[in-house]
Amino acid sequence: GKWRLAAQFAVSFIIVTGLYLYVDIDGHLVVPLVPLKTAYPYLPKYLFIPLMTLIIVGGANAVNLTDGMDSLATVPLMTCAMFVGIVAYIGGDTDLATKLKIPSLSHDIKELAVLSALVISAGVAFLKYNSPPALIYMGDLGALALGSMVSAMFIFVKAELFLPIVGGIFVFSVLSSIIQRTFFRYILWSKGRKKAERYRFFLRSPYHHHLQRLWTYSEKGQDVVSVWVILLNKLGINPVPEENKLLTPQEVNSRVIWHMHIKSIWLFVLTMIIYFKVR
């Protein structure tokens, strides 16, 4: 609720302020696709601290929102941790950082690579029991804690602006929910409740629930019209594989989860290329 969100902002603001004042963190930002020699912008503390607070709170809640299906949030968290670990290890080596034209970080930042390895190892073990059908669950506490921790790790390695790329699965979960709610309110205001109940941008939100519903075959078809599906059809893209007619609901769930996991791996590869090669 609102009080929980307010508490998250308050605690995150205190933590970020402490990090800014007492740890080797400044207001410089590494901008994706822009070489350091071209732009290495500096934000004053009255802008930097609120932005970092927003990143931590946003990251925590994005992970929590994505954790709507068994194991769905686990692999994207692992790819985010892997990216931070690699950046921390290389950035903590002055010679390597200079050679690869990335920000040179404190030598102590290499310890963050150990924390990243722990997150990845825990994720692998967790997958054994969290894969569908799950025996244990991440829950709000786990998702919020891991999301805020991994988001803070990006701040330590000066890669805050890369979090939306490697963590694109989390970002799209949030965006799909915002788009869905905004579209519903617009149709409700302009066309009335009957139209708003019938026409949605996605069948459901967040996006993984849209895929879950879209890929579950029904002879009667969908009782909600999705603008997103209509747009894809007009572009000549069939969003529903034909073989889905033969899938059980459990198999559909597994396919959706694998679909999102594979995308998170591709986003990790893309982010690595952007960070280390596009300079």
Question: At which residue positions do the language-model features occur?
Answer:
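Membrane-interfacial loop-to-helix junctions in multi-pass inner-membrane proteins
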Residues: G1-A7
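Extended accessory regions or peripheral subdomains of proteins
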Residues: A10-V11
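Alpha-helical transmembrane segments
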Residues: I15-L29, L33-V34, L47-M52, I56-T248, ...
